[in-house]
Amino acid sequence: MVVGLVLVPFESEAASKKPRKSATVSTAKHKASAKSSRIKSQRVTKYKSSRMSVKLRKSSAINQAYAADDYDGISPLNLASAKALVINQNTNEIIYAKNTNAPTPIASVTKLMTAMVILDSGVSLQEEVTVTNADVDYLKGTSSRLPIGTRLTRDELINLALIASENRAASALATTYPGGRAQFIREMNQKAISLGMVNTHFSDSTGLDSSNVSTAEDLAKMVNAAYQYDVIRNASTTSSYDVYLSNRPAHFNNTNSLVRNSDWVIGLSKTGFINEAGRCLVMQAQLAGEPVIIVLLDSFGKYSRIGDANRVRKWVEHNTEPKPTQDLDAVPITLGQVDSTAQLN
C-alpha cells in the first residue's frame, strides 16, 4: 500500500511567507528581542548572584561568630578581622598579628582619643554644655537620642560617648572645647604624635569621618594610653548608663556585649563601625592572669568581631601559663615592625 503524505506547513511557517522586506524586519525584531532577553537574563542572574553572595557572606560572618563557641583553643588562631593585633600589655609579646601596619578607618574607636583630650585639658567635667545643630551628623545621616538643646555635663557626655558611642556627645565635647572644634582636632593629632602613633590621623571627634585612620599597631598604643585614665576604664566597661533627657530617664547600653559576659574580665573597651571601617573592637582584658590588648579592625558582619575576641580568649587561656598580674601603671607600648601577614604565637 502506498501512503501519500501531504505536508501541511505549521502556522508560523505559513505566516512567514510574506514579502522579503517584512521577513527581514521580523527577523531583526526577533534578534533584538532575543538579545534584550539575554541581557535581562544576565542582569537578573548577576543581581541574584550578587544578592546570594551578600547573603552567604552574612551567613558566614554569623557562623564564624557562633563557631567560636566550638573553638577548642588548640587549633591555630585564625581571625576574621582584616587587621588585628593581640599583645601582652606587660611584656609587649605579640600573640597574634595580621596586617598591623595597614592604615584603615577606625570609626568610633576614635572616641578613646576624644576622651583623653578632654581629660588632659583640665576643663571642668561637671560643667554643663549644650548639644547644638553643629553636632548633628550631616555626613552619614546617623540618628541620635540626644535632641538639639540637650544640656549635659562633660562627664555625662564622656560616658555616653564611650558606653553607647553617642556621636552627638562626642561632637559636643569638641564644639564646646576652648578654641572650638579645630583646636580640639589639633590636640587629638598632637596627642597621637606624643604616643608614637605615626600612622594615625584624626579629622573629627566622633569617627564618622572615614579620614580618621590608624593602624592596629598604633591603636594598641592608644589603648594602652587610654587604660591609664580611671574615667575611661570605668566608663568604657560600664554595661549600661542612665541620664535624664527632656526630664525623662533614658537608658543606654554598652555597644560591646562582652562587658556583660561573665567569662570576660575587661579593663577597657570600645567598638566602632562605619561602612568604610567595617566592624571594629579594641579592648584591654585579663586573659590567663595576664593583661592583654586586643585590636580587631575591619571585620565583616555584626558578630564576627565578637567571635574573634572569643577565639583570642580561648587561645590565650589554653596556651598561656597563668602568671601573677603586674602593676599596669604607665606600661609603654613600643611595638616594632611586624610582618603584615605574620601569625606569631
PLM regions and their residue ranges:
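Bacterial N-terminal signal peptides
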Residues: 1-6
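Penicillin-recognizing serine hydrolase domain
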Residues: 16-20, 50, 54-81, 180-345
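Active-site-adjacent loops and short helices of periplasmic peptidoglycan-processing enzymes
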Residues: 43-217, 221-230, 287
